[in-house]
A protein has these predicted regions:
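Residue-level signature of outer-membrane beta-barrel architecture
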Residues: 26-28, 66-70, 112-118, 186-192, ...
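Outer-membrane beta-barrel transmembrane domain signature of Gram-negative proteins
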Residues: 157-262
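Hydrophobic, lipid-facing positions within transmembrane beta-strands of outer-membrane proteins
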Residues: 18-22, 58-62, 104-110, 180-186, ...
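Structural signature of Gram-negative outer-membrane beta-barrels, strongest in the C-terminal barrel
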Residues: 236-349
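Transmembrane beta-strands of outer-membrane beta-barrel pores
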Residues: 11-17, 28, 41-45, 78-86, ...
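Outer-membrane beta-barrel translocator/receptor signature
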Residues: 1-48, 54-60, 71-72
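Repeated loop/turn-to-beta-strand initiation elements of outer-membrane beta-barrel proteins
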Residues: 4-7, 30-35, 70-76, 117-124, ...
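Flexible loop and strand-edge segments within Gram-negative outer membrane beta-barrel domains
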Residues: 43-61, 65-126, 130-160, 171-179
Length: 349
């Protein structure tokens, strides 16, 4: 919540969840602005018979807002969640088995609105934000085999001698994701009124950068990874940038005792990813909507538009799959074996 508010404290306990939270809005007085703060602690248990599989989250937020000289409205804020779980001490788990999860999210945002209220402009607003999601999981898992198992981890096409997995061992799988996004926008708004017609014009430009700087998916000891497993580095993928321009006009016209609302808009987007075929991908999306409110209970509406959806990050960079074909195998000594595989990466068409 924004604005001046009293202290608000919440305590909640049930068999699965424990929660404590607080919030407060402070008026600094003498037109110095308002500060809002909040905090939260939550512990959620997945299984009542195993409290060690619980997730703990600590959330916080802080924000400042003020209007200078009645024409400049400024806001800035920071929010975050620090969470995770650790089942290492679970006595019900297999000896030595555990899972650790780190889930931290931070977001900073600011905005500046120029409340001009002129004949040619109503307001101009600038927004900017940064989003960071640090998510890391560590699974320490036991494996047991009755016979010797080959393990192919080749990441190039060709013939390779397969490695061998031990009969009994622990393997540590890591998934390290660090999503880091940036965004900024500038919006122009113009509100007008002509007799029985109300007009609202919006136009602006937006930019967003999306990427991941995490180490990705891998095993601490690559030789203990399961057969066919390959690591995947998230930071190896380039950033995806999106720039868009848009304009939208909304009209409200009183027709007798009824109200007719018309909206027309046009949006242009440009997607570019350095070093790829998507360095100059443009889309144009027009749309039109109409609504005729006959009375409180009856309305007629319709619309037309063309939407072109830009590919998401997971569509552009799917997991690389491989085909591993055993071409030779031999057994010798005390039931030991050797295998030769032909590995071939799949190619997207």
């Amino acid at each position: 919540k924004k604005g001046k508010t009293p202290w608000n404290v919440l305590l909640s306990i049930n068999p699965r969840t424990e929660q404590v939270s607080f919030s407060k809005g402070l008026d600094l007085g003498n037109d110095k602005g308002i500060v809002n703060i909040s905090g939260e602690w939550i512990k959620a248990t997945q299984k009542l018979n195993s409290p060690y599989t619980s997730y703990t989250r600590r959330g916080f937020s802080a924000g400042y807002s003020n209007t200078f000289r009645k024409v400049l409205r400024f806001d800035i804020g920071l929010t975050g969640n620090i969470g995770g779980m650790n089942t290492k001490d679970d006595p019900d788990a297999y000896t030595g088995e555990y899972t650790k999860v780190r889930d931290n999210v931070f977001r900073a945002n600011t905005s500046l609105a120029w409340l001009l209220n002129k004949s040619w402009i109503t307001n101009l607003k600038l927004d900017a934000s940064v989003y960071y999601n640090d998510n890391k999981s560590h699974a320490h898992t036991p494996y047991s085999y009755a016979s010797e198992q080959p393990a192919v981890h080749a990441e190039q096409e060709g013939y390779f001698i397969a490695g061998k997995l031990p009969y009994h061992f622990f393997a540590d799988q890591i998934v390290d994701s660090k999503e880091l996004d940036y965004a900024a926008s500038l919006k122009y708004e113009w509100n007008r009124r002509f007799k029985n017609v109300t007009s609202n014009l919006k136009a602006g430009v937006q930019w967003k950068g999306t990427g991941n700087v995490g180490d990705g998916e891998y095993y601490q000891n690559p030789s203990l990874a399961p057969n066919g497993y390959r690591p995947r580095s998230y930071s190896a993928y380039p950033y995806m940038h999106n720039v868009s321009l848009y304009a939208e006009e909304s009209l409200s016209v009183a027709v007798g005792s009824t109200m007719l609302r018309l909206m027309a808009g046009l949006r242009w987007e440009n997607l570019f990813i350095s070093g790829t075929q998507y360095d100059k991908l443009n889309t144009l999306s027009p749309r039109f909507n109409a609504r005729w409110q006959l009375n409180e209970n009856i309305a007629i509406r319709g619309g037309w538009g063309v939407t072109e959806k830009l590919p998401s990050y997971y569509v552009l960079y799917p997991r690389q799959e491989y085909r591993d074909i055993q071409t030779f195998g031999v057994s010798y000594n005390n039931n030991e074996s050797a295998y030769v595989y032909y590995s071939q990466p799949y190619t997207l068409l």
